[in-house]
UniProtKB/Swiss-Prot annotation:
One Gene Ontology term, aspect cellular component: cytosolic large ribosomal subunit
GO terms for biological process, alphabetical: translation
Name of the protein described by the UniProt record: Large ribosomal subunit protein uL18
Keyword RNA-binding among record annotations: yes
HAMAP family: Ribosomal_uL18_B (MF_01337_B)
Keyword RNA-binding: yes
Keyword set, alphabetical order: Ribonucleoprotein, Ribosomal protein, RNA-binding, rRNA-binding
Native species: Cupriavidus metallidurans (strain ATCC 43123 / DSM 2839 / NBRC 102507 / CH34) (Ralstonia metallidurans)
InterPro entries on file: Ribosomal_uL18_bac-type (IPR004389), Ribosomal_uL18_bac/euk (IPR005484)
Quaternary structure (record): Part of the 50S ribosomal subunit; part of the 5S rRNA/L5/L18/L25 subcomplex. Contacts the 5S and 23S rRNAs.
Similarity field: Belongs to the universal ribosomal protein uL18 family.
Pfam families: Ribosomal_L18p
Length: 119
């Protein structure tokens, strides 16, 4: 019988396999109880082109404490989009890593779209 974590990892594996076939840059989101992380990977999946998280000092200055909020995810989404555009990345595939597209994950994706990333 599968637990919640195994089910999430199975969904993530399926998504990553489909994105790998497309050979495009991938925006990956990882969510914990206290932080949210976002990274843009190259099409081969071995090189990180841009990253942002609520664990960064610059992001923490913008937040009023907790890094596990929708507002924090919005800041991270905007920041990772700016860094990706600076690295020359305009279009990505969104990898939600098996997490539901709701709440913090959705806020990060919406902020990245508003900042100019296309997916």
């Amino acid at each position: 019988m599968m637990n919640k974590k195994d089910a999430r990892l199975r969904r993530a594996r399926q998504t990553r396999a489909k994105i790998a076939e497309l050979k495009v840059n991938r925006l990956t989101v990882f969510r914990t109880n206290s932080h949210i992380y976002a990274q843009v990977y190259s099409p081969c999946g071995t090189q990180v082109l841009a990253s942002a998280s609520t664990a960064e000092a610059e992001v923490r200055k913008e937040l009023n404490g907790n890094g596990a909020t929708v507002a924090a995810a919005t800041v991270v989404g905007k920041r990772v989009a700016e860094k990706a555009k600076a690295a020359g990345v305009e279009t990505v595939a969104f990898d939600r890593a098996g997490f539901r597209f709701h709440g913090r994950v959705k806020a990060l994706a919406d902020a990245a779209r508003e900042a100019g990333l296309k997916f």
